[in-house]
Regions:
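Regulatory N- and C-terminal appendages and interdomain linkers associated
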Residues: 2-173
């Protein structure tokens, strides 16, 4: 009947509106996460390109993303060498670092508590960017031990480590 067709058209229009809105919603949500991972609290137009450039640099130089995000905290605290050390060519990150540092400084300078803002950025970064993630080889080792030998000890240690992803236990990085 025409009522059914009208309902279907209306439902399709509603779903289409939601689907059409999704890319913008997703991009905005992703940018909010990236700002946090970069240690930024305010919104600036260049933030998406800053995050994209960092990710492209990591990919181009085959740098471990998790470690790089984590070592931004060291850079925020004034020592970019741990981040640079992840790159085969340690100076490759320098142009991006200058942009990120300028962006952080602009945010800090706008804050009447700028000294506090600088001091807490590294802490925020360490609370946002995990050090421990479920790396494939670690999960496979735990699964192999459990399935081949019924040994859950490695699984239990991995699970315990993953329950504290922001700790600095280098055994699980």
């Amino acid at each position: 009947s025409s009522d059914d067709e009208t309902e279907v058209k209306h439902a399709v229009a509603q779903v289409t509106d939601v689907i059409d809105a999704f890319p913008a919603w997703y991009a905005d949500a992703l940018l909010q996460v990236q700002r946090a991972k970069l240690g930024l609290q305010t919104e600036q137009a260049e933030d998406a390109s800053l995050a994209d450039a960092f990710l492209a640099l990591l990919q181009q130089h085959q740098v471990d993303f998790t470690q790089a995000w984590r070592r931004l905290a060291d850079a925020a605290a004034g020592d970019a060498n741990p981040l640079r050390a992840l790159f085969a060519e340690s100076t490759a990150i320098n142009p991006w670092l200058l942009q990120w540092q300028a962006r952080c400084a602009a945010e800090d300078d706008a804050d009447p508590q700028a000294a506090t803002a600088r001091a807490v950025r590294a802490v925020r970064l360490r609370q946002t960017n995990p050090r421990i993630i479920p790396r494939n080889h670690r999960v496979e080792e735990a699964l192999a031990a459990a399935s081949a030998h019924g040994d859950l000890s490695l699984f239990n240690r991995l699970l315990a480590a993953l329950q504290q992803p922001f700790s600095d236990d280098p055994a699980w990085a």
